[in-house]
Amino acid sequence: MTLTEIQNVEKENAGASVPKHSSNKLKLEKELEKLEIVDQTKAASAEETNNESEVNELDADEPMLQDLDNRFVIFPLKHHDIWNFYKKAVASFWTVEEVDLGKDMNDWEKMNGDEQYFISRILAFFAASDGIVNENLCERFSNEVQVSEARFFYGFQIAIENIHSEMYSKLIETYIRDETERNTLFNAVDEFEFIKKKADWALRWISDKKASFAERLIAFAAVEGIFFSGSFASIFWLKKRGLMPGLTHSNELISRDEGLHRDFACLLYSKLQKKLTQQRIYDIIKDAVAIEQEFLTEALPVDMIGMNCRLMSQYIEFVADHLLVELGCDKLYKSKNPFDFMENISIDGKTNFFEKRVSEYQRPGVMVNEAERQFDLEADF
């Protein structure tokens, strides 16, 4: 029965006695209820379709986002530069078990309350942030990008981000003995407003159905290239002081990984046909810089561990300029790097930290080309 037929029957039965037609009335009401649910579902589906078409229209002609018949097979390679990034990621694979935290507790127990507070909150931020990056990769980027080489990279990045999250969680579990405080740190997004603010900014880009792929790509390049930069620098400051060897070793590995992820985002952006205006990129980057500066100079000031807040603010601007140049834009802040100990740490394009890593950080044989694999009996030994 249609909705109109049901309503007509209801009108006919309106004057009838209740006992005689009560069962029919109940049936009609149930059927009417079902039809209303169906109508609501159809309306919601139509609205969702409209939203999807709006999203698709923004990126409709972007080749990298279009379905490809051969996207399930990697060879023959079509994007050798993207593939090279994937192989670099594989070569740099590491596990939490490789990081020795045995000597850290002596340093931790010698630190004052401010230093312990600062480090624990930085670790809490990192533990949550890697999960947010993965949320974006799983929900959006790896589903949208159809280029096989890029999908390989994203698949491996998800695994690496999981290792980062595990590492930070292990650091918290090792340093923080009080269970209540530990649980508070594991729920940092809900417990600390200054961490929630950064998380909300990143999450907004995941849920924004109207933002173009290019905008979201820039936003997450800012997450990994700006939101992490000051926190990395604060931990490297501890290394300069000869403290926390396990923490600083993991920081070296993770900052190298994130530098690679940031550079990959810039490479992918360079391949997009529909690029953003320089002003739009500036708007996204300025937003991220302001949040990061507030985070490390007001909400969780680095002077708690003996760093200079003004110089940290300058360093964040320097990092932002580096990202802008990689994206093909002019520098916005023109700030110099105030921290000599951060020269070559996944930031300076002249000497990439990935290329300077010690040999044990790289998986053997992964980046070796075919010519180097050949065994020559006439070679000099």
UniProtKB/Swiss-Prot annotation:
InterPro entries: Ferritin-like_SF, RNR-like, RNR_small, RNR_small_AS, RNR_small_fam. Fe cation 2 binds at residues 161, 224, 258, 261. Its cofactor is Fe cation. Keywords: Deoxyribonucleotide synthesis, Iron, Metal-binding, Oxidoreductase. Fe cation 1 binds at residues 130, 161, 164. It comes from the Eukaryota. One of its GO terms (molecular function) is ribonucleoside-diphosphate reductase activity, thioredoxin disulfide as acceptor. This is Ribonucleoside-diphosphate reductase small chain. It comes from Caenorhabditis elegans.
